C-alpha cells in the first residue's frame, strides 16, 4: 500500500509565507466581502476614520487656527486560540494527494519531488481550514455545543446588538415567501442610516446575503424581458449587483441547517471595512502547522494551532433583515373547536414571543389569541374556538418586528 510518511512542520516565518498569508490575501479574501486582518499588532484593533468636517477658514491674518481632527472609531477584536485537526487513513490520504498532483498539467509524474508532494498536502489542509474559518466567522457561537463554536461569529454579534436607538444595529424581519429579493435589497437601502448611504461613492458598500436570497435575485433578473438578461441567463453572471453595490452570496446554507437557533435567511448592507476577520500566528506561543504519519494507527494527521476572531465596528454602518422563521406543525391540525397546537420554529434565539389565533374560513378571528410557550424552537399551547379553519401565528422578534404565518 502506498503511503506518505515524511513529516512537515511550519512555524515562525514559514507559517506565514507558505501557509497562512496566501490563504488570507488576494482575490479570495476580497470575495468574502469583509476586511481580513492577518498578523496585525496585538491587541488586534479594528479602526475606522470618519472624515473631518469643514476645515476651510477665512484667511484674515497669518497664524494657526487648526480645526478639529478627524474622528477615529476603534474596537478591539477578541482572539480565541483554536486548533484545526484532520486525520485520514494512509490509503485515502495518498489517493487524495495523488489526485491533486495528477490534476495539474505541469507536473512530471516520473519525477515527483518533495516540493510537489508538500504543495499538494498543504493545499488540502489549507482548503479545509479556510472553509472552517469562513463558516465560523458567520455562524460561530461559543455557547453552542459541537461545530462552529470556537469563536463568536458576525451573526450572533449583530443580532445581540439590534435595537431602535442610534447605537443599535438596525434589523427588520422579512418573509422570503412574501417579498421579492429586489424589494428586500431596496428596503435595506431605503432604511439604511444616512451615514451608511453617504459611503456609497467610496465603492466599499456591499450586500451580504444567504444563498436563498441570492438565487431568488438571480431568477428575478433572468425574468426581465431584455436581450441582455436572456444572454446572461444562458452564459451566467460573474457577479450580481444592485444599484452598483455588489451582492455577495456568503454560502452558509449547509451550516445554517445545523444551527436551528439562528435565522435561516438574512441579508445585510454594510461597508466592507466595518466587518473584520482577524487571524494571528505571530504573537502567541504554540502556533504551528504540523503534518505527520502515525504508523500505529496507519493514519496521516494534520494539525494547525493559531488565533482567530471576528467583529464589527459601527452599528450605524449596518442595515440588516432577518427571515427564515417558517413554522413547522409538529402536532395534529387544530380542529374546528380548538385543541393542542405545537409548532417548531427556526431562529428561536431571535424570537421574543409567538402568538396563535384561530381564524374562520371567512377570514374572521375565532376565539381568543394565546401566547405559545416553549424552548429550543418548539412552541405549544391550547386554542379554543367554534369554527376554526386555520391558525394564524404572529412571531414577534426581539427587536420588535413581527411576522405572520398561517398553519
Which residues make up each language-model segment?
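Assembly/oligomerization interface modules of large self-assembling protein complexes
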Residues: 18-102
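Alpha-helical scaffold segments that mediate packing/assembly in large oligomeric complexes
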Residues: 105-190
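Surface-exposed, short loops/turns at beta-strand junctions within beta-sandwich domains
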Residues: 382-389
